[in-house]
């Protein structure tokens, strides 16, 4: 996950449902960058959109993080 997406998720978890403009002002990113990243986060299920506001669920973020971590674990089989 890139830095902007991480900052968006942290912002939403701290501040609750927010508009694209509020997120951009909060993390210091352009509206076009925010919209692009919010689209990716929404498609991944990490962010939900309701009307003009976006929100993040701590539970969903934790589930995705655990799945991501598990995808990199290597299982060592005994000889």
Regions found by a protein language model. Name each.
Residues 22-25:
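A short acidic, leucine-rich amphipathic alpha-helix
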Residues 55-79:
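Conserved segment of winged-helix/HTH DNA-binding domains
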């Amino acid at each position: 996950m890139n830095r902007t997406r991480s900052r968006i998720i942290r912002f939403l978890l701290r501040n609750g449902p927010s508009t694209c403009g509020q997120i951009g002002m909060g993390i210091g990113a352009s509206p076009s960058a925010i919209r692009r990243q919010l689209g990716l986060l929404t498609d991944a299920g990490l962010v939900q959109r309701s009307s003009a506001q976006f929100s993040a669920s701590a539970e969903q973020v934790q589930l995705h993080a655990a799945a991501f971590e598990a995808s990199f674990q290597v299982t060592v089989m005994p000889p």
